[in-house]
Amino acid sequence: MKEFIIKANKAVTNGEINLKDLPGSSGRLDLLCRCVNSAFFLSHDMRRDTIFYSVNYGSPNPPVALKFVGSELKRVSPDERSIALFIKKALEKDASDLWKESTSGIYSSKREFRDIISEKKSEGKRIFYLHLNGKPLEDFEFKDDEDFLFVLGDHIGIGDEDEEFLEELGAEKISLSPLELHADHCIILVHNILDRLK
């Protein structure tokens, strides 16, 4: 199982989303939509072995975590507007400590970025933090029977405190490129690496 989590520092935390202004008034929700696209959509199929989390820290009610489960997703199209509509529905739910399903395979909860990562660590997932200054990809060995969580930052990053948290947790810091990449591009590169193990 492949899982991804992104800290969305400015992404809105209620359903008041302007679909005509995803990058601006919605707190770079366009970036989140592109990550969902990269996590799940193939040319004529979807990745069913993937889960994607976004933890939104924008106004008015942070944090709100969103969970997308590939094996359960239905009716979502790959374009940003369609994905944003489904995110809007999820954010219209009153978030609580429990995951609440808004539409098939999409859930929301009142959870912190660190809490989800800690939970995945306790489940035995191998945690990778994707960072420009990490060890080169070639230095790591991946096995097809392992479960992974890949941690991503948005255009702002995850911040020093969360980086320290990941280091203390034993997350492996990995670099996919000598150049700084967009989060959605990193997801595609990770998928490509793991696809080749099959």
UniProtKB/Swiss-Prot annotation:
S-adenosyl-L-methionine binds at residues 130, 153, 176-181, 186. Disulfide bonds: none annotated. It is an enzyme of class 2 (transferase). It comes from the Archaea. It catalyses: pseudouridine(54) in tRNA + S-adenosyl-L-methionine = N(1)-methylpseudouridine(54) in tRNA + S-adenosyl-L-homocysteine + H(+). GO terms for biological process: tRNA methylation. This is tRNA (pseudouridine(54)-N(1))-methyltransferase.
